């Protein structure tokens, strides 16, 4: 079995295959494992996450017990901290004006749920307003949550996401957590997959190695 990418999903797949004693190769284009989970350490030594940082839906997030197992510190919090403020057209956006953002967000959620209930598997961009007052802001949050643009996110992924409103930051760094957890997995680093050929005779991968 070939697993492409040594992010959290790829590492989990490799661990599952190893547990079943199924031969596999794990191919990673980068020089490290972890994908978007990447922690760096500035001169002051404090961990700084360049990618993901929060364990969302903490009570059902499998990385919470993993963090406990590897003694990686995290903080149990009730919220994200100070609320975001928006600056537009040279001035701060008022709370009253932000009501339209909440309304547009709710409209998008309803449109996504309605399309999915009809058996339509489209991208977020295809079923939501593209010229709304807050489209760019909502697109920003979609990308922030999924790491891809709205035209690449399936509405099925959005609907299936279970949000418990428990969001805990990883104090020692999410990248460090994933790195520790995946350190025992055999992986071929600096091995980018350039092409996948899938036919009657099987699957063939072209890599840089």
Please give the residue ranges for each predicted region:
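FAD-dinucleotide binding site
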Residues: 1-209
